[in-house]
Amino acid sequence: MGLLAGLHRHDRLIVVALLLGVMLVSWLYLIAGMDLPMPAMDGMAMDGMGMPVAAPAWTATRFLLTLAMWLAMMAVMMLPGAVPMLLFYDSIAQKRSSPAIGRTLLFALGYLLVWLGFSVGAVVLQYGLDRAGLLSPLLRTTSTALSGAVLVAAGLYQWTSLKQACLRQCRSPLDFVMTQWRGGNGGALAMGLRHGVFCLGCCWMLMLLLFVGG
């Protein structure tokens, strides 16, 4: 039993170390991006006449860099809150079938895939707003009406039954595991996807406020 407990602790340390590594890399990417001529910042440059230079056209490179920025932001914002769920899942999976580190990592992968999907959607939305002339170089909406509508919608959404249902599953590891448990590797990935969807259901409107505040 002592050896088994030691293996469980070792697996949990690996999971925590990997999550911290992802968050650290994401933070470093965002910090480094502040000093790089990222496409989103090019529109802030001034030419010789003191006039702002227009932001560059959307290319595959700009899309990928913007996607990386969004994904890094999602990682640093959402992974810390997912750690308790991942560790709780790991402890339950260990009791059911040891070792479970592979399934725990599949759970984490499913969770991150949801936020990757959201990041792709955010880039598409950013592209649409930019093409419509509704986005400033600081990534803020230039339309007061649109900003107001997003703020009101985000506030109202907090009181909906959908938000509350998602919140119960997202913030309570015990409730989620008891109602959403799936066995095996495929089940671990599916649970990660489900947990990610529930957490996305809690936060997606709040994430859109990034377009209001920049």
Task: Explain the meaning of each model-derived region.
Residues 1-71, 95-96, 134-139, 160-182:
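Histidine-/acidic- and/or cysteine-rich, low-complexity loops and terminal segments associated
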Residues 2-5, 58, 67-112:
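Juxtamembrane transmembrane-helix termini in multi-pass membrane transport proteins
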